[in-house]
């Protein structure tokens, strides 16, 4: 990484379990901090793994900080003196402290540990499931609202969902469809 990929963006580090991905990610971020290129964030798929990474960083003398109990950023992270260690739900939610639009916390480099698990958690956080049996009126309203977009994805599946209450099909409403309503 240091010799060949240091200046590149959007890198994927792929190693087998137990081969040191966590330490490599922490060292990559530490090198960015050493060069004055902070703030840096290390994202884990869950709080349990974030706790493990915290202790591993401490074991190797890598300075990490955590979001405070009152949900604010520690100064050593903001100043680029420590890696912020957090988990995906802290970042991807409707009330993220990282901010939106012009009110946001600048971050220079991010390492996402176990990206597949993080992406699954993000997807789940932004997924709304409506049970036809428990919320028939709401279910019908949503299906009607997005009928054209859902038919474009697959008319047969749409008909199965519309006519057969026990069918186990799932159709996703694309994000861009929200701008059509």
Which residues fall in each region the model found?
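Conserved motor-coupling elements within RecA-like helicase/translocase cores
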Residues: 70-84
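Conserved Walker A/P-loop ATP-binding site and its immediately adjacent core
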Residues: 19-69, 89-93
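Pre-Walker A (Motif I) flank of P-loop NTPase domains
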Residues: 6-13, 38-39, 81-83
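Conserved coupling segment at the C-terminus of the helicase ATP-binding
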Residues: 6, 10-12, 16, 106-109, ...
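Hydrophobic helix-cap positions at the C-terminus of alpha-helices
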Residues: 3-4, 32
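Alpha-helical scaffold elements adjacent to nucleotide-binding pockets in ATP/GTP-utilizing enzyme cores
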Residues: 28, 49-60, 84-87, 110, ...
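Conserved RecA-like ASCE ATPase "motif II neighborhood" in helicase/translocase motors
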Residues: 80-114, 119-125
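Conserved, well-folded catalytic cores of nucleic-acid-processing
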Residues: 35, 60, 94, 118, ...
